[in-house]
Amino acid sequence: MTTVNAPEFVRHPKLIAWVEEIANLTKPAKIEWCDGSEEEYQRLIDLMIANGTMQKLNQEKHPGSYLANSDPSDVARVEDRTYICSQNKEDAGATNNWEDPAVMREKLNGLFEGSMKGRTMYVVPFSMGPLGSHIAHIGIELTDSPYVAVSMRKMARMGKAVYDVLGTDGEFVPCVHTVGAPLAEGQKDVAWPCNPEKYIVHYPETREIWSFGSGYGGNALLGKKCLALRIASVMGREQGWLAEHMLILGVTNPQGEKHYIAAAFPSACGKTNFAMLIPPAGYEGWKIETVGDDIAWIKPGEDGRLYAINPEAGFFGVAPGTNTKTNPNCMATLHKDVIYTNVAVTDDGQVWWEGLSKEVPANLTNWKGQPHVNGEKAAHPNARFTVAAGQCPSIDADWENPAGVPISAFIFGGRRADTVPLVSEAFDWVDGVYKAATMGSETTAAAVGQQGIVRRDPFAMLPFAGYNMADYFDHWLNLGAKVSEKAEASGNKLPKIFNVNWFRRDAEGNFVWPGFGQNMRVLEWIIDRCEGRANAVETPIGFVPTYEDLNWEGTEFTKEQFDLITNQDKDQWVTEIESHTELFNKLGERLPKALKERQAALLEAVKTGF
């Protein structure tokens, strides 16, 4: 039997007993209690270099940075192997995979039995959110992956201080992770152990996370999507707050007025770029600061305003496409102390990925560790960087404020070649919830004259809501109603809700809107709408700006181009709104009546108003 040997700084009997229980099940060779120290981090990195899991990069160009290459079968989140095992199938809903918790526990017990043999079990204590914040929550991850242990040090507040907050009886979310590759005595390990069979399992009622078979990011760093979205969304519903797949940014105008915005976009729609936006020419004196690029926990304050924290402490970003043009702040963040995964590497130890430079360097080693062949991808399309958020030059001064930052507006957006205009403001909270609930994004780049397939991704939460999506919509509606009363009593108001679409195309299939830094022009209008000083035109689908309502200083974007990305076509909108029925039917009887009514009213308005 493995000795638990909890260090003195762990004073939580229930936690120690749980570690012992999991050790008896998984049978690791030894247990290591992580303290989050620099010494521990370096020791684990050196261990992985010796094992061939990681390689040291050129320390002149990439100080303190390392590269891991995963097994080619273990490169992304596995949505089809991700389960919400609520007691009642209906509570998971039609958009989640469900299995009876008793059946799943039996299955997992079999898989986890002896799964850590020959390996070290790391006890990784972490806080999602600033330590001690009333918005934060603590998790403990037991993992046999040193890659997970070092990555969690960047992605969360990880280490000894967590135990001080936890004390002798504090609450924590138990997270168990194994790569599912036990080692027999004398068996040589592989560089990236994993198992073809994978399970990412959440038990919402008992707030547990069990992950088997994958060493990759979102499947293995259990504080991220598993705790911060799937389990936290369940907690938020019960406790009256929101856990959202949103970036948070701060905008300050030249007069010193500051607003915080939370925005939800599906994957590959530019969340990180938007969170770190640099204002373009014509916006001298404006400042954009980053609170978070992926997840927001939002709680109502006593004053009826909604306050958000970024529960993470790092960025786990997609590398391909990132460069000094698309995201200079992100590139500056990567100047040191980065863990790269599945990028390519040059013969002198520098990283490379598609989009980093026009020229492909000679003598490149691809993400599979083989010489790069022209015409093939050198970096995996989902290659990642893991880096501490504090290194970001645009990080907001209040990004770790335990009280959170007050949100003025929510923005929702997807990738649409037509139909949806550049920006529109919802008529009210219910209308905004309807628009977010039905937002769609094209899964394929639309060819000329051919629409991509629109995948409904409600609130950009389709893979991340830990309970029935219809109940999730209901929670948003109820929260709005509750907070609205409180806000009015304090002279405040609910955040406004906006929809954006940076991805409209012209007849030739080209993007019309330049995007990136130019999105600032839309952001300024949004803020001015929040302050009640910008004009808008009422249309059947919301309030939209005219060409004259936006600031065009420093650019030559024409009225004709603007009309191309803001025009609204009656037939397209009728088709669009009717297509929402498919999602609503899938969600069944639990769908809030208010959303069906909104659909009928919107359809009527579109048919008669254009």
Curated annotation (Swiss-Prot):
GO terms for MF: GTP binding; manganese ion binding; phosphoenolpyruvate carboxykinase (GTP) activity
Keyword Manganese: yes
Binding positions (substrate): R77, Y216, G217, G218, S267, N382, A383, R384
Pathway: Carbohydrate biosynthesis; gluconeogenesis
Enzyme Commission number: 4.1.1.32
Coiled-coil spans in chain: none
Official protein name in the record: Phosphoenolpyruvate carboxykinase [GTP]
Originating organism: Acinetobacter baumannii (strain SDF)
Gene transcribed to yield this protein: pckG
